[in-house]
Amino acid sequence: MKKVHFIGIGGIGISAIARFLFEKGHKISGSDIKESKTTQELKEQGMDVITPHCKEAIKDQDFVVYSAAIKDDNVELVEARKKGIKCFSRKEILPYVLEDKRVFAVAGAHGKSTTSAMLSSLIEGSVIIGAISKQFGSNMRYAQSDNVVFEADESDSSFLNSNPYLAVVTNAEPEHMEHYDYDLAKFYAAYKGFLERAKVRVINAEDEFLSTLKLDAIRLFPSSDITELAMVVRDYQPYTSFNLKNLGKFEVFGMGQHIAIDASLAILAALHETPLKDIRENLLNFKGIKKRFDILSADKNFILIDDYAHHPTEIRATLNSVFEYAKLLGVSNVTAIFQPHRYTRLSTNLEGFKECFKGVDELVILPVYAAGEKPIEVDMKGAFSEYSPIFTDKVERVGEAIEFTDEFGVKNRLSDGIVVGFGAGDISVQLRGGY
């Protein structure tokens, strides 16, 4: 048994690893900048978690793990290094966590959380992912098994440390380019390196970069391999059915072509571990993941959806699904609430963001969630002028409605049609309120 301390333990990726090592029998402590639902849950599970960070948290731990958000001057990190305790980033600790496991690793700019969660429904084993699966209510599931379904992150190239037995790549659209010195060759080399580390590879072969690879791989061609795509709504819950290659018909929770693609990649990966009949049945156990087309409230008058999409490609894919969902329900009004996430992402992808909201009836824009970045000047009013957007500092959930005060002091209330919030910051907390 090791004593392991996690700095930034409330983060979605770090908390999953902490939970996994705790279940393996290690003594886990941790800290974060403030209390959250996650830190409370970790305490309830038996971990020693404190807030905020303080040097007294560093005692006699065997090693310390810190999240990507932690800077070198963090008081706990400084204290641990002063005491000579080994310190590892999340990226650096992965070989220790995964070294003796048969890892089913899922990477990609978009869809990796959903695909990972779907795959965790299809095969037996532990699960370490960057989202809360509604099937088991956590970002981690522990099993006495060599198998681990792992969501592999390209943002800091940590997927290269994931020891994949089987590697899935949903797509390789350039993102987090600051980590790769804005060098596309470095970025694509990392994806190629990730795939080369695996014995089995499953890829979306219609991705611009992945289509050029000469590696031995199981290839999904969505435009021809996925047929008879159909969507249906039952009790306000979305489902997608489709035929995959010569494998027959499947149904999965969620709505849209991108959901069928994610499910197809998970199915092709699971075929190495699970009989086809069981895959078809197990896929029905998937109930979606938190913050992905997450229906918070639904009745005949008002539907509120929380979605983590924070890149133009993701927002457009989700909105296409929302429009289809609205059509099936006979709803005519769709309002989008957008909280930009990181100044660098907003400025780099501004043209994409200007285009991705086409079709919405109303656009509400929140301030940029900086995530620690320094501000970059962006003319938001000019960029989004075609939408005549409403700007507000925050939104509030009030019963079955969303309320906010706009920049002119006028109070607004959204209580009919579909309202969908987009962002990776704290918009989810605003939309949920105390509900």
From Swiss-Prot:
> Which positions bind ATP?
G108, A109, H110, G111, K112, S113, T114
Task: Give the pathway listed in the UniProt entry for this protein.
Answer: Cell wall biogenesis; peptidoglycan biosynthesis
Its protein name is UDP-N-acetylmuramate--L-alanine ligase
The cellular component terms of Gene Ontology attached to this UniProt record, alphabetical and capped at eight, are: cytoplasm
**Reaction catalysis annotation:** UDP-N-acetyl-alpha-D-muramate + L-alanine + ATP = UDP-N-acetyl-alpha-D-muramoyl-L-alanine + ADP + phosphate + H(+)
Q: Where in the cell is it found?
A: Cytoplasm
Query: What GO molecular function annotations does the UniProt record carry, in alphabetical order?
Result: ATP binding; UDP-N-acetylmuramate-L-alanine ligase activity
Please report the organism this UniProt entry assigns to the protein.
Answer: Campylobacter curvus (strain 525.92)
